[in-house]
């Protein structure tokens, strides 16, 4: 036990030094500072029954990305005279022991909107309050406090981007520096009998490492996040003209987006700092794009989804979710596995799914294609099943955003133009006319035919083609009624889809 005033900084997300108000407050006036990260078995313990390497909740790529982020955080803390203390176990039990043994007077951690952390944080705060420990839990993972937006809207979250932007206005911190740069931190006090460890390796956690070819090319950590952001911001013309949903989902050498989403997910990069950097570019160019399509607009989309997710009970499911259409999706696990394991027989779809498995990341338009294909576009499989696959495999998997995107792309919420389908053929033909992207992830295909899947593809992916033959090419009248639409509205679309499938699967 250390004498003097001791603070504990509990890292979960927010794995950074810059713009970290919880860390700044923990350091202020403290003789000793304990920066802690808990290896939570809920997220990190290997699951031998999962369909891919990883834990019950996360694939190996995301676990590796997190570990890299922790190593980088530890190095950055050491530069300030501190270090990261890694402990293992159920987080609340670990924290209770640390708070007591280290005689902590101040507990600081970033506010988190996810239901899992809401329940965990309430448990920890109850214990800390009873022990007379000061608690500081600021909102710094998002641009705005979701609770403030919901309060402004009469107690319910806004359900359109436009209404959210109108309610949110300009962030209060936007016109002034968001934080002072830390130059030092209080030392770590005595850790007593608490079992402290270094940041574990993949092997330490009980996993077998994968070949280089099966690892994500994106390295975790604040240092890499800032490097990537500055590289993107340096191209002022690109920032000024950024316009989503434009972009090339087949780009391999240099992705057509910033690829900052995993760094924002883990808080290696502050969304507030990124926002200010974009603003600075916009102030120094003659013209630029505007929300919702601009780069700044993408950060606002992120906050919009966080706000809706935070204010909507059962947001991550169809049942008892008041904003989700109750659609009679198929619970066909054979079709799900064919999609998940890249065995649909559609080269464009399968190549994207292999990219997901290997990289843990895909361009947003690629995500749209495969999500639409699984749900309303072709297979009519429940969006929750696709959501679970993305949640496991994406390195940027974010509870609020992942669920929101699946609700959107399945036309279950936010977006209801059911007949706007991403064709598994023409979309690939448009963006990958020479088949370079497809052959990169499906090298066994020597020739890529976008109009008719090649015989070679049919032979290799025969199982998936047998599954696809069970489809009738259209949604039933009952299914369309559940969407609040008339069958005749989609007659042409259905006929076209049916002819296309019959051609492909004959």
Language-model region placement:
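Short, loop-centered acidic/histidine patches that primarily coordinate divalent metals
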Residues: 112, 411, 444
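Glycine/tryptophan-enriched, flexible segments
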Residues: 154-325, 428, 432-506
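Active-site-proximal binding-pocket segments
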Residues: 253-439
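Alpha-helical packing segments of well-folded alpha/beta enzyme cores
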Residues: 22, 69, 73, 225-232, ...
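Generic recognition of cysteine residues
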Residues: 98, 108, 127, 136, ...
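Residue-level preference for long, well-ordered alpha-helices that form the structural scaffold
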Residues: 55-62, 66, 218, 341, ...
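Trp/Phe/Arg-rich N-terminal binding region typifying the photolyase-homology
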Residues: 1-183, 291, 354, 389, ...
């Amino acid at each position: 036990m250390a004498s003097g005033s001791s603070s504990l900084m509990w890292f979960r997300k927010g794995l950074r030094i810059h713009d970290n108000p919880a860390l700044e407050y923990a350091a202020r006036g403290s003789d000793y500072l304990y920066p802690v990260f808990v290896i939570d078995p809920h997220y990190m313990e290997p699951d031998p029954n999962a369909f891919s390497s990883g834990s019950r909740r996360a694939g190996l790529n995301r676990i590796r990305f997190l570990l890299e982020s922790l190593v980088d955080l530890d190095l950055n803390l050491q530069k300030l005279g501190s270090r990261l203390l890694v402990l293992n176990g159920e987080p609340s039990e670990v924290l209770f022991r640390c708070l007591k043994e280290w005689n902590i007077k101040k507990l600081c951690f970033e506010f988190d909107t996810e239901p899992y952390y809401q329940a965990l944080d309430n448990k920890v705060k109850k214990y800390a309050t009873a022990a007379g420990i000061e608690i500081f839990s600021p909102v710094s993972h998002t641009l705005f406090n979701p609770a403030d937006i919901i309060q402004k809207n009469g107690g319910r979250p806004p359900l359109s981007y436009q209404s959210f932007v109108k309610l949110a206005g300009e962030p209060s911190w936007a016109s002034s520096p968001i934080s002072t740069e830390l130059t030092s931190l209080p030392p770590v006090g005595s850790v007593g009998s608490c079992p402290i460890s270094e940041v574990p390796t993949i092997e330490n956690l009980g996993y077998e490492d994968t070949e280089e070819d099966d690892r994500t090319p994106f390295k975790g950590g604040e240092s890499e996040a800032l490097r990537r952001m500055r590289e993107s911001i340096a191209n002022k013309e690109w920032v000024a003209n950024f316009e989503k949903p434009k972009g090339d989902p087949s780009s391999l050498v240099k992705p057509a987006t910033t690829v900052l989403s995993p760094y924002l997910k883990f808080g290696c990069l502050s969304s507030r700092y990124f926002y200010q950097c974009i603003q600075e570019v916009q102030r120094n160019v003659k013209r630029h794009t505007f929300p919702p399509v601009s780069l700044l607009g993408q950060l606002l989309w992120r906050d919009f989804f966080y706000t809706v997710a935070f204010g909507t009970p059962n947001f991550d499911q169809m049942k008892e979710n008041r904003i989700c259409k109750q659609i009679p999706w198929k619970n066909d696990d054979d079709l799900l596995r064919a999609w998940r394991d890249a065995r649909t027989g559609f080269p464009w779809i399968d190549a994207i799914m292999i990219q997901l498995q290997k990289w843990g990341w895909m361009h947003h338009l690629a995500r749209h294609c495969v999500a639409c294909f699984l749900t309303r576009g072709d297979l009519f499989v429940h969006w929750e099943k696709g959501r679970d696959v993305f949640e496991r495999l994406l390195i940027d998997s974010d509870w609020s955003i992942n669920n929101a995107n699946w609700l959107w792309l399945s036309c279950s919420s936010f977006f209801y133009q059911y007949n706007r389908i991403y064709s598994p053929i023409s979309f690939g033909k448009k963006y990958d006319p020479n088949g370079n992207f497809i052959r990169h992830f499906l090298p066994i295909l020597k020739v890529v035919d976008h109009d008719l899947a090649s015989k070679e593809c049919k032979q290799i992916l025969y199982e998936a083609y047998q599954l696809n033959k069970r489809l009738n090419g259209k949604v039933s009248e009952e299914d369309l009624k559940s969407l609040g639409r008339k069958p005749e509205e989609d007659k042409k679309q259905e006929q076209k889809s049916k002819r296309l499938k019959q051609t492909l699967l004959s």
